[in-house]
Amino acid sequence: ARNLYTEQTVAELTAMLAHPKVIATGETGLDYYWTKNEGNALDWQRARFRTHIAAAKQTRKPLIIHTRNAKDDTIAIMREEKADEIGGVMHCFTEDVAMAKAALDLGFYISFSGIVSFKNAKVVHETAAYVPMDRLLIETDSPYLAPVPHRGQQNEPAYVRHVAQAIADLKGMR
């Protein structure tokens, strides 16, 4: 097995993305939640993210981007690397309206998971209410992040209806 920390080149990723069954690039992005910058771990993440964007653009396979505790760097890199040329989805989105606006301006869709149904997820509630319906997606992120009323259980695709209901409630839809 390959070491997870082995650097993949754009050429290697492009070759993998060229497979006809591959329809998107990712999940990629930045997650600073658990990472300290020991051994330049953040630099490593940023470099890999840039590599993934380059490969996505070369193969015309949209990006599936995850970001956690890294919104400024994520948007900066998306802009610098011209991710708007390929577009994609901001997966399991938990950031604020400002970041959603920036991602929408770059042509990305915003996807919400079961977190949007959590009472304490006020920032996610505000963001879901803001995102236009034609740019909003729902997901399970299964087996994690089961929505209320299944919070704490293993998530499954059937629960996505609770994500949809939570968003409909936030948008005042009946």
Language-model-detected regions and their locations in the chain:
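Mid-domain alpha/beta scaffold segments of enzyme catalytic cores
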Residues: 1-174
